[in-house]
From Swiss-Prot:
It comes from Danio rerio. The keyword Cell inner membrane does not apply. Its main location: nucleus. GO terms for cellular component: chromosome, centromeric region; nucleus. This is Borealin-2. GO terms for biological process: cell division. PANTHER family: AUSTRALIN, ISOFORM A-RELATED (PTHR16040), BOREALIN-2 (PTHR16040:SF10). Residues 1-24, 107-156 are annotated as: Disordered. Residues 124-135 have a biased composition (Polar residues).
């Protein structure tokens, strides 16, 4: 009977050791899982913080770019509302707004043309000639006054007559110079007004909202880099419109 009891005790002790070993393995596995979950959550939180920082930087740059674009926009667009732009009755921004300004009473604000370099040089030359014509007349008046004081009765009459004649000649010269200056100015103004009335102009709107004023006077001063695809398309439409109207006028004149 003694050996049987020893076998049972040994079997019970072996079973308890196996259970304890499996329990310890479960505890270790749960601890590893907890550590893995904590590390994963920490890395995820760090990644979220980094993405939020990048998003804030991106929003700041977008805000700056938006403010710069608002500063570049013309003042007329600052006051317009979105519902006005979305209205179907209003004309679109890309449409061509063109005005051929000829001799017509409908023009309320005529074009103001700056004088050219030739006109400025001509006016400066006229002013110089008028100032030079005034200086010798004043130089002639001074000796006549001296001769009046030093002359006798007969000589004074002769000097007075010569003085009056010279004064009248000087006045005639002044009047003729003024008339010539007025005539030249009138011709220049009439020519400038005629040129302004007969000059063809066009207003082009680019895709960025910039309005370009095109005319024969400033055709060499236009920056070609500002003319984008929208502006070129508008100019092509203008050319087609002008060709159509010219052909229509020719047909009307032949009839």
């Amino acid at each position: 009977m003694a050996p049987r009891r020893t076998r049972k005790v040994s079997q019970d002790s072996d079973g308890q050791a196996d259970d304890q070993h499996s329990f310890e393995q479960k505890i270790r596995l749960t601890k590893r899982k907890e550590l893995f979950i904590q590390q994963f959550e920490k890395e995820a939180q760090d990644r979220i913080n980094e993405m939020e920082a990048n998003l804030n930087k991106l929003l700041a740059t977008v805000d700056r770019v938006f403010k710069i674009e608002l500063m570049k926009m013309p003042l007329s667009l600052h006051t317009t509302l979105i519902k006005d732009l979305m209205n179907d009755d209003d004309t679109s921004v890309g449409e061509v707004t063109m005005a051929l300004k000829c001799a017509s009473p409908e023009i309320q604000k005529p074009l103001s043309r700056k004088p050219s370099k030739k006109a400025l040089n001509a006016l400066a030359g006229q002013q110089r000639s008028s100032s030079q014509s005034k200086t010798p007349i004043e130089g002639q008046k001074k000796p006549t006054k001296k001769t009046l004081h030093s002359s006798k009765s007969t000589g004074s009459l002769r000097c007075a007559s010569t003085i009056n004649a010279k004064r009248t000649q000087g006045r005639v010269v002044k009047l003729s110079d003024q008339a010539n200056a007025l005539g030249v100015q009138f011709r220049q103004t009439s020519r400038s007004v005629g040129d302004e009335l007969m000059m063809a102009t066009a207003t082009i709107v680019t895709s960025h909202g910039e309005t370009l004023f095109l005319s024969e006077d400033n055709k060499d001063e236009i920056n070609v880099e500002l003319l984008d695809d929208a502006a070129v398309n508008q100019m092509r439409k203008i050319k087609e419109l002008m060709d159509y109207l010219c052909n229509k006028v020719r047909i009307n004149n032949t009839c």
